[in-house]
């Protein structure tokens, strides 16, 4: 399995700013984001399940004011940060999880089907 660095682990703090990165998902370029919740890093495609559009109006701002839920800024859909499950608002299922690992102070995403590294 190929690992691609996303950011330094210290850049992600519980319930705060995310770190965006690019992936190919089924051959299509898509933004993804990594967040930390309860000390664990999670990552998802940056696509609301209500309408397939990016969720953040302000770059890297996904958490609500409490730092407990991921929100779509456009329509208010709310998702659990640890599972991506829809917990409220207009959504059709959960977020697509991107596999990540935290090793030696670095957060990596795991390049494996249906995800591919985006090469410019």
Language-model features, listed with the residues they occupy:
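A conserved acidic, glycine/proline-rich C-terminal tail/linker
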Residues: 85-86
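Short cysteine clusters
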Residues: 48, 72-75
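Axial heme c-ligation environment in periplasmic c-type cytochrome domains
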Residues: 89-90
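N-terminal pre-ligand scaffold of iron-sulfur
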Residues: 1-66, 80-81, 94-120
């Amino acid at each position: 399995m190929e690992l691609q660095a996303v950011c330094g682990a210290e850049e992600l703090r519980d319930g705060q700013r995310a770190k965006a990165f690019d992936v190919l998902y089924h051959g299509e370029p898509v933004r993804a984001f990594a967040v930390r919740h309860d000390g664990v890093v999670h990552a998802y495609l940056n696509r609301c399940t209500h309408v397939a559009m990016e969720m953040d109006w302000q770059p890297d701002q996904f958490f609500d004011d409490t730092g407990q839920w991921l929100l779509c800024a456009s329509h208010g859909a709310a998702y659990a940060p640890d599972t991506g499950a829809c917990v409220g608002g207009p959504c059709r299922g959960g977020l697509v999880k991107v596999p990540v690992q935290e090793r030696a102070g670095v957060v990596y995403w795991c390049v494996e089907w249906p995800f591919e590294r985006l090469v410019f």
